[in-house]
Amino acid sequence: QLMAAKQWDEFDRLLDGKLTSMLYPRYNRDYLRLNSYLLREDHKRADEMFDLLLGLNLPKMQRVDLVIKAFNYYVGQEDRKKSKELLHEIKGFEGGQAEAVAHECQLMYDTMILKRHNDIPELERMLKEAGDDKVKSCRLEYLLALQYKNKGDEAKFQEFLEKSGQHSMAVNA
């Protein structure tokens, strides 16, 4: 509730409190702290928290979750070096949806970091295959918008950006 209300000082005091320290493991508290820094757009402290958490020896699923979260953050920050390191780790994941996740992360890296536009046909195919999956459609439309922007096609950029925004509102409704 404190995070939703953006009452950051109280939130920080609660996380640092004795009772919270006794009830919740350090990783969970630090992960919550990371999320609060991301919401605050406090990039310096978010970077520090990512460095701390990524340096821990974590169970596989926690590691996968954290690495993908960090990758998305650093791609959004256009941090080529950290994005590339995390993408390399993501490509090493095994099991479940690992291959599909790695492929989508590669598309994000190519689009947002390398500013490529050569994946438009593939992204359009993937969008058709997404069907009624609004979350996936939103993500793919956003990548398509950026690829068209990278290509210099302002009309298509605006078209897919608007579609992505509509799906985003439907997902968050």
How would you name each of these model-derived features?
Residues Q1-Q62:
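N-terminal topogenic membrane-targeting module
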